[in-house]
Amino acid sequence: MLPTEKCKGNGVITMKIISRLFAAVLSAAVVLPSMAGSGEVFKADAATNVVISPYNTYVINGGKFEGWGTSLCWWANRVGYSDSLAQKCADTFYGEDGLRLNIARFNIGGGDNPSHNHITRTDSNMPGYTKYNNGQVTYDWSADYNQRNVLRRCIQAAGDDMIVEMFSNSPPYYMTKSGCSSGGTDGGKNNLKDDCYDDFAEYLAEVSYHYKNEWGIDIQSITPTNEPYTNFWYAGSPKQEGCHFDIGNSESTVILELQKSMKKRGMGDVIISASDETSIDTQIDAFKALSSEAKSAVGRIDTHTYGGYKRSELKDVALNAGKNLWMSEVDGNGTAGQNAGAMAPGLWLSQRITDDCNGLNASAWILWQVIDKHVCAAGYNGKKDSGMVDMTKGFWGTAVADHDKNEIVLSKKYYCFGQYTRYIRPGMTMLNSAGNTLTAYDKDNDQLVIVAYNTSSGKSDMTFDLSQFDECGTSAKAIRTSNYENWADAGKININNSSLSVSLEPNSVTTYIVDGVKGGKALTGKIAVNSANVTGSDPWKNDTNNTCKKVFDGSTSTFFDGVGNGWVQADLGESYSLTALGFAPRSGYEYRCEGGRFLISDDGSNWKELYTVKSQPTGGMNYITKLPENISGRYIRYEVPDGTPPNGKDSTYCCNIAEIELYGQPAGMTSLEALAPVKVSGSAPYKDSSDDCSKAFDGSNSTFFDGVGSGWVKADLGGICSLDAIGYCPRKGYEYRCLDGEFFTSMDGLNWDKVGSISGVPSFSTNYINLADKDIRARYVMYKVPDGAPANTVNPDSVYCCNIAEIGIYGKLEGLNGDVDGNGRYEVADLVLTQKFLLGAGDLDKWENADLNADKRVDAFDLVLLRQLIVSK
């Protein structure tokens, strides 16, 4: 990194090692003309309302947060000579009493030509692990002791949550075209020799293997490049190592070679991440340009956010590719706030964290390096240290290492960082939240964490609407950092009617912890909407790409670009009782949803209010689970008001919305009682996999029965039942395989009656066959597909395949067949009672439970069926 302003420390902290570590080895970056952040002053308008919902989770990594971190280079290379400073750093940044970081990005230095002396910083001349002599390469495992010394201590401090990622800034100098690990003679061209891609991969893999097998370092991931598609890595640089790789073939080749080398050493389970571009927008282009093989090899996208702004697009790129996404490096000398003093750099950092996490939905956020400045009168290795910084101005890092005093000097930027890192912990579920807030939910411990910053010189009032949770506590604990406080206990704030109203202090960052929070049960019964039944107003300039039909196309990346008096409406085909509503605003235009209304109607003319968007929603899907009681209808409409909105940006309300989702059941099926089978049987799954018939009754639409030709699945309800409905969900992505499928019922499991068939391709949701008016009594229910080739035009398979995700059977159990003594079980004692009755040696109090074949009499046939039932149990 480039040295920037000096900083004046505000305190010294020494911390003991507890059982936590969070080390992140972040790769080097350069100061760009502008950072990819908002930089705006944030003062919430009077009682700004923010809805927090357990359903509005980040889409990346299933919403699961992996943690916070920093790069170990270069600061660990500088402080690691001193066990005392190394330990203080581990405690300060990774320990329980410190930042509680848990990710360390460890730099595998390439190592420059020993004859070179152009790097002037005391910390950034990273050693390599090889020595080169007349074409002969030998490994020196004593190299890089300093960084390794810090890493080990950080791992001990962080504990079980620790994640280590290896990364490279440059290959060894002798593998480069320029003969220099700082870059090429032309910074815009590849600097790795064309015949050294495999050699470079071997180098990275061998070092990783040694760290794992010789030093016991558990490596989660490795990335071979750092800001590769830039033009500022040039030979003789005074700053650091760096290497240009072209996007496309060059980056693909190094990824695939690294995959080979890691697999060869039995390290194929280590994630290969890519490609740590300096800009969000460049990262999008770089990933898209990878070969299909390289994309498959990449387990996670790592991006820096020094430039670019297309966070939502990169999120979608990662999501559509099935990849995790990290914000793996950023920092800078920015400031924020009004007359904020020492808080200015920390408020800037808070903005960056909030923008990056909410915009990217990243599962980890990693600072470049926590220490960027060093104080030492003697310097280091003949070079002069940068000295202290002015903490009221922008500076890189969060702390300064004073080697003369053997101290770590902390700043407000450090404490602002800790408002996030200490309380939003690995494993929590990240929730999308609006404006100046970052939110996480710990479902295991029933805890909600909200972090909010205020960059205004006056107080800022906010209200957090927690009504979408099933339960929430009675108060929130507040922890605050301001110009006068560091992680201070700011008391408790009462929660009234699921509403948390707070007043943010001027130029402050506050963390709110709410205990006793529960919610987020899986949404079921998603209603399929046929695009042919979607109508609406005209889009802006009659653009045929952004029409109202985009609102129900299943993608939050597309949108309806409606204008003033705009609306979109869907005909559901029949009346539904709604249990939940989901909507996604157009990305970047979330403010246009404020004031929008959702309406419901039985006839498409007379409308009732379903929900009004009272404040700017968050990006992504927003789910509303507390709708008016007993609300039902056939038509759903979203519209915006007339006139000028209060957003201060548009002259008229614009109907901009990306997606709408609806959940519920057909109106006549709202009081259905589920019947649990006592036994499930079926045909064999494809290749005898674990996706057997039991998956059709495991309660999850995510699993499925992978049955093949002539396949079937049967449920034994344990007794005669009056059936009201059968629900079913097709296997996702293979919905067409349910077309022509049939449902049968039986009293005895031998004689079957067809009660329903699937006449169209069903949606991936719960679909229903209504049996309430058919007076159907049965003990067994079976789903099966026809024999032979599909007799329809939409199924491309050569044979019908019995693929189904879930089946639900609804009704009432009339009595447990076989439970002759009425104790709730069928067992040998029931067999004995029935046999005595048939021999005239006793009576039956519940004779109907012994009538297993439902012929209105108890005879030897029932005795045989009861014996079979008990044996099968």
Protein language model regions, located:
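C-terminal beta-strand-rich structural cap/linker in extracellular carbohydrate-active enzymes
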Residues: 493-518
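Aromatic/acidic polysaccharide-binding cleft in carbohydrate-active enzymes
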Residues: 327-416, 432-433
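Active-site neighborhood of glycoside hydrolase catalytic domains
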Residues: 199-206, 210-218, 228-333
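Glycan-recognition and catalytic regions of carbohydrate-active enzymes
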Residues: 398-447, 484, 520, 556, ...
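Aromatic, loop-rich ligand-recognition surfaces of beta-strand-rich domains
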Residues: 552-611, 617-670, 684, 697-756, ...
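N-terminal catalytic cores of secreted or lumenal carbohydrate-active enzymes
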Residues: 47-220, 224, 256
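Carbohydrate-binding surface patches
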Residues: 422, 432-474, 507
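Cellulosome-associated attachment modules in secreted, modular CAZymes
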Residues: 21-22, 32-42, 665-668, 812-873
